[in-house]
Amino acid sequence: MASEGAKRQPETQNGAAVGLAQVAESLECPGTEECLVPAHETCRSPGEDKCPVGHSLEPELQEEGIKVGEEGLNAGVEAGEERGPKPTSSIVRPAHGPKRKSEVELPPGVLQKKEEPEGSHSESSLSSKQHKKAKKRKSGGAPVPPAVASASAPAAETLGLEPFALPWVLAGKAQRLRPLYQYINYCNPELNQEEDGDREPEVEPEAELALVPEEPGVEQLQLQTLLPVAGELGLGLALPCPNPLVPLTHNLPPLVEEVGEEPGGLSSLRVSGSLKAEVDKTTQVDIDKMLSVCAAPLVPPLSPQYK
């Protein structure tokens, strides 16, 4: 190999010397038309001896130079192979970090042993997490604390009821709040309906009206007992009222009767009858007013009014 390279080197040197000689001839050539003629035309001329050799040798020199370069590369590769094969080490990228380097250096058996404890550790961590979640779910449905349960049990025993009857009792209490306002809600008497056990004896308004006329009769009797005193005092004097609560309208009929008895009996009876009717009407009006005031809603009803 070395001898072949030494032989080819003088050939290349000879080619380079011929090329330089041609360049020098071209520079020495005077400015004539013969110098401007291309190389292939000069070769076709009858004077073939004058044909420049440099142009014809250029492609051969180029081919030889390419062959020499290829052979030099092949020789370098062969020399590298003769020196010895390079150790094939596993190329590790720096992005993977030191852990991957250590894994590459370790044999596969050790790697499998390492992977097994890691997998078991991950499984144990997952099972512990699931256990904690299950505990949280159980604690989420918070049962009734024992203190509250024990407090509700004695309450049921003191009432003499079974434990399941407590909601019914509470509902009954909520329903019994309504009859407290039965005397206020007069616009809708349908809402005041009660059960048979909760009803209380109510006094009918007709019975009250029937009792009302008796009160003026008692007052009239009291006034009649005082009539002789009024006669002694005289007709012009006013009769003192024994009871301040008694209205003055009740004092008029006896006086009118006495006045009417003096002139004549018939006229006095007519006047007294008309006055009694007027007095009864006025008393009835007063009674109606009192009843209307008593029946008025003192407090606005809390229950909704459906009209």
UniProtKB/Swiss-Prot annotation:
The ranges of region (Disordered) come to 42-153
- Where along the chain is composition biased (Basic and acidic residues)? 42-52, 112-121
PANTHER family associated with the record: CHROMOSOME 16 OPEN READING FRAME 86
- Give the protein name, as stated in the record: Uncharacterized protein C16orf86 homolog
Q: Which cysteines are joined by disulfide bonds?
A: none
Return the Basic residues bias intervals: 129-139
The record's annotation in InterPro entries points to:
DUF4691
